[in-house]
Amino acid sequence: MDQCRASDTINLGVLTRGGNAYLLRYKGEENWSSDLSTASQALDVNVLHHLILQPACGIDTRNQHDLGHLTYVRGNEPPLEIIKNISDYDFVFFVNPPDLDQIFAVAETGETMPQKSTYFYPKVYSGLVTAGIGD
């Protein structure tokens, strides 16, 4: 998947319960049924959500009930525990994370990023810090 990141094409990895592996390439020819901006349509995770999970599996990732059918694994390394226990799953999808340019492009449209799509390091610390003034 890391090698596919360098291309302008959206690529998704798929591993099936039977152990077959596939590389899906999105050519940008699908008509989107949602009103997502072009910036959002360019996200690998939205291709997975709107063009695979929703129409083929009936899973709406915006519906909390449907999320019970999904397991999210973060990180750049292959999820070895899932691969070892592939019989517990029907499919494993590998999706590239968005780069900063994609995040900024979506932010400029006023849309929000899909769940879990901005899980990256280093995290920016947030909160309120106060310091005493004077003695």
Model-assigned labels for residue ranges:
Residues M1-D135:
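Surface-exposed, charge/polar-rich loops and edge strands
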